[in-house]
Amino acid sequence: MNFNKTFLTLGLAATLLQMPTSSFAQNAGGKRQNPLLVKSSLPFGAPDFSKIQESDYLPAFEAGIKEQRANIQKIISNKKKPTFQNTILAYENSGMLLDRVSNVFFGLTSAHKTPGIAEAQKKVMPLLTDLDNEISFNQKLFERIKYVYDHEYNKLKGEDKRLTEVIYKGFVRSGALLSPEKMERMKQINTRISDLQEQFGNLLPAATNNAVVWVNSKEELAGLSDADIAQCKKDAESLGNKAPYCIVIVNTTQQAILTNLQNRELRRKVYMASIHRADGTDPKFNTFPIVTEIAKLRAEKGQLMGYNTYADYSLEKTMAKNAKNVNNFLQSLIKEYAPKAEAETREIEAYAQKSEGKDFKLQPYDRFYYSAKMKKEMLNISDDEIKPYFNVDSVQINGVFYAAHRVYGLNFKQRKDIPTYHPDMKVFEVSDKSGKPIALFYSDYFRRPTKRGGAWMSAFAKQSDKWGQLPIIYNVCNNAKAPEGQPTLITWDEVCTMFHEFGHALHGMLSKCGYNTLSGTAVARDFVEMPSQFNESFASIPEIFDHYARHTETGAAMPADLKERMLKSINFQPAYALGENLAATCLDLAWHELTPDEIPSPYMAGAFEKEALNNVGLLNSQIPPRYSTTYFNHVWGGGYAAGYYSYLWTEVLAVNVADYFAKHGALDPAIGQAFRDKVLSRGNTKDQMEMFTDFTGMKEPDASGFLKARGL
């Protein structure tokens, strides 16, 4: 149970000064102490990466597991009647050391997975899975928890009541009420899924790195900016110099670099490398056997728990409640989207035929290129024209941080004295308007071979008043870093990603909860993306935009005409962005609405994907899923199984919240304080629909503004 609680972070993420030092920290004979097992002496109790060695993690996990086992044994050996204090609270506190070690280690497995970290992960995961099964199916422990839930729940108040409910239902959903035979099978399923997810997590980054496209001459890169060409050269050097240049593949199906790449054959190679990265085209990189087995085990798990499918089992704890409601929501969007997507594709192809001839057939690897040319012609704008105004440092300090200062009264001070796990990382002390420190924030914005694709937020330490712990939060992105001495310039999409991930960070940093289990982003998947998507809205608010969108050389604000054209371009041909998300969402649901007998073999999985998309009217080579089955890390390696819809679902919530802010004052600190008090600070201490209603006054979300906000 604590295993699940620890790792369901975003993306997935304190002062430890009052956290008790583990009894396992001391080493005999005055030998070096494992820094993961002793209280950090750094400000805020931050993890001391200058002292932590890769060899420290495995013994630290072993000590944390041993300590939690001992604490669980104390709970079940207690002869006194079960109470909130001696059972629920004791369980909440049973894994403090393990939480601390896990939060640091799993930050590295995603953002800086060196061979040493990868090897440690192989050894750690089976230990954690065994512990999770051991605790989840400990009948003596569950009997005590159930007794408190049955006899004390209605007498408890506030967070004590909520914590009791969350812990009890967590055990039930893990299978604590199953028969002994079904419990044993559930343990086997959990263990195998954990092993398979680790395999997927190792194979996919390797497949993505293997899928790079090598380029022999600079001429082949025609259309790219000097900075992009320099990045291709730098990437080639870091990946072995098999050719003078290379194009790395990012985590999504479409590749942004195709926007400017003139060489059609090279565009085709890049696109094909992306979609075939892990489907067995190269026999060493085939995730189909892994994902089909995970899908089958999840389907069996859902049925063991009394549900027809895994989707219904998983969705019960969300705002959506079941697969039927999600499918109805998606169909309402598809109905509006489909004709616009067809018209958009015809429009782009007709434009391309003007220069390429009437027989030219638009291919998926052409779409970004001709759409960009069309946008430049119609709006007279391109990424190369606007990127000089988006220096990553200015976006962070004068945009992301400035918006948080204006709306929530937060201040940020860089702490160069606090060590990090990589030189690219920065650390900031966050304080409120009174000057009181409330959090540490780490940013790690640049891609490297040891980092998986995408962007995410998580925590080195979650907030907890009961543990005397302030939050230590981090954001990770994958922006291409400029050569030494040059400023890193990013695209508008990357600007929005920084605002998005910082929305998650605010959810973690502004948390004010008693219990670790309930704090920060520990909310339903179809609510957790709301604060992040809402925070994106600040990127284009004039007072914020003008503050960070400054020319990297002159410091001049973006000219009004360019700004107007850029903002108009945000929703230029918007069907693609919605379509790729709809397709990925429906693909996720299709896999998790199958019964065990319906799961296709690895050899038929590709055909199943096409059939699933065709069934909902989304089989469209021009608008492929944002992630296809073989590289859908959110679903097979992360916590979004049957939950990828939450990005669209929460976008509806975010539009409603943004509309409320716009109506009452987008940068009004009073409105920001209300949002902080009623939503961001509350964690999972209250039903999320109630939080939404408390802030907006709406009884339920209104989807009418969603398509309008999307430009559709």
Report each predicted region and the residues it spans.
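Active-site-proximal, well-structured secondary-structure segments within enzyme catalytic domains
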Residues: L163, D195, N202, A207-V248, ...
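Intrinsically disordered or highly flexible coil/loop and linker segments, enriched in small
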Residues: L16, P20, K66, A70, ...
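N-terminal helix-rich structural modules
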Residues: N27-C232, F661
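Bacterial Sec-dependent N-terminal signal peptides
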Residues: M1-G29
